[in-house]
Amino acid sequence: MGLSWTVPLEWGKNLSASNPLGFLPDHQLDPAFRANTNNPDWDFNPKKDPWPEANKVGVGAYGPGFTPPHGGLLGWSPQSQGTLTTLPADPPPASTNRQSGRQPTPISPPLRDSHPQAMQWNSTAFHQALQNPKVRGLYFPAGGSSSGIVNPVPTIASHISSIFSRIGDPAPNMENITSGFLGPLLVLQAGFFLLTRILTIPQSLDSWWTSLNFLGGVPVCPGLNSQSPTSNHSPISCPPTCPGYRWMCLRRFIIFLFILLLCLIFLLVLLDYQGMLPVCPLIPGSSTTSTGPCKTCTTPAQGNSMYPSCCCTKPSDGNCTCIPIPSSWAFAKYLWEWASVRFSWLSLLVPFVQWFVGLSPTVWLSAIWMMWYWGPNLYNILSPFIPLLPIFFCLWVYI
């Protein structure tokens, strides 16, 4: 026996109609109550409404127009009727423990009250207790012994150390690994930057060289050739088809030789300053060092130096003379002595130079004045060599 729903077509009249899909308003039908037209109170729905209000569009859980205002598919709850209600949250239960939470740490009693036996120890009692193998094993787990008589008891620390000795050390520190990788990368980046800057030195010097031939004007290479005429361009960037290309290559080659000579001079000065050029000085009264059988050094060098500290020569009288080699600037002193012998007037400059250096305020004022007057021109000339300064500094520090 199926259930049916009564549709009120007219006022006060109810007819029975089937509700197979359940989309019509929900009304409770009790077959035992024998609901029919003669019994109008057949509907047990407490939220029932007259038919004109049922035709109104209600706002329910499925949006406007989907759920009737008197229940339906979702039942009779306030949410299904389109009414949102917020229930207050239940208050937390009252705590019965009034001592909850972190309590303050009680003050520790004095050592004489908590450990009275520790106050009775002294140096003598401690050394006597160390005679016990068990106690000594706690203080000397690695087997150390001051008397060499007592054998300590092996402890857990000794077992762990033996295990690590068999299986290897723990994982290495990642900070050391990172620094080991970043160091070479930074050096490589700095080297690449200096290389790119050094490659610009020939072009800068070439531009300065060519500007000397075009005083008061812009250096322009016409570049006219019978085979392949080209437009006007800078003389420092001539194409291979330009007649000025060979002169540009020649200038670049001379500039490279000049830079190489400058680096060699700097390296020579550095080695001479470090004392790595043991040059025999000139014997007073002679222009050259004579060659003879006793030219080798007969006095050993002082300290751990691998270079001789003196040089023995055989002058014209036949007697060997040993002259000590300066520990620094030996080659420079040799060149100065050689130049003083060749050009006697250089010796007259020594007192003047010593006097001028002694006047330090005058020297500094003169240097400041010269830099103020010639500074811009010197900067334009020396600016191409600025990338070489870091290389010279590294050589000076690490050699």
UniProtKB/Swiss-Prot annotation:
Residues assigned to the Intravirion compartment are 2-252, 202-252, 369-374
- Topological domain, Virion surface: which ranges? 2-180, 274-347, 398-399
Q: What InterPro entries does the record tag this protein with? A: HBV_HBSAG (IPR000349)
Membrane-spanning ranges: 181-201, 253-273, 348-368, 375-397
Keyword Acetylation present in the record's keywords: the answer is: yes
A Pfam family reported for this protein in Swiss-Prot or TrEMBL: vMSA
Glycans attached where? 319
Q: Where in the cell is it found?
A: Virion membrane
Region feature (Pre-S): 2-173
Domains (record comment): The large envelope protein is synthesized with the pre-S region at the cytosolic side of the endoplasmic reticulum and, hence will be within the virion after budding. Therefore the pre-S region is not N-glycosylated. Later a post-translational translocation of N-terminal pre-S and TM1 domains occur in about 50% of proteins at the virion surface. These molecules change their topology by an unknown mechanism, resulting in exposure of pre-S region at virion surface.
Q: What is this protein called?
A: Large envelope protein
Gene responsible for this protein: S
